[in-house]
């Protein structure tokens, strides 16, 4: 009985992590791409300026956006289709690792990279659970 309860708890933790990551990514890329936040790289006030601050072209921002939104939606789908969770988490984790590297590249204070580090950590947990 205890093992069963533990499995249910772990499954709920996994679902919570998937939804936290997915909704956070969708918030940034769909609801707030043009809004300033304290976490944008460099002195950027929106996503386009942030990618420019990293020295990355607009087309690259579009590719990253499509990948992040697609992988976030895959994490939502993984609530029902469990086999999708690990590849989606690994893909998003790699993109978040890239985000951390870009923050380091432009010498941002660590506080600006904290959301990317947090999402990277949650993606690692999803991939390993």
State the predicted function of each range.
Residues 2-129:
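Membrane-interface extramembranous regions
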């Amino acid at each position: 009985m205890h093992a069963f309860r533990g499995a249910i708890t772990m499954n709920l933790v996994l679902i919570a992590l998937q939804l936290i990551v997915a909704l956070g990514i969708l918030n940034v890329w769909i609801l707030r791409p043009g809004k300033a936040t304290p976490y944008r790289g460099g002195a950027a006030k929106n996503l386009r300026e942030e990618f420019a601050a990293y020295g990355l072209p607009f087309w690259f921002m579009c590719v990253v956006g499509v990948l992040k939104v697609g992988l976030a939606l895959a994490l939502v789908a993984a609530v029902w289709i469990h086999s999708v969770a690990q590849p989606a988490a690994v893909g998003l984790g790699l993109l978040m690792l890239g985000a951390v590297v870009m923050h380091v590249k432009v010498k941002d204070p660590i506080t600006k990279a904290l959301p990317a580090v947090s999402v990277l950590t949650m993606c690692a947990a999803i991939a390993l659970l």
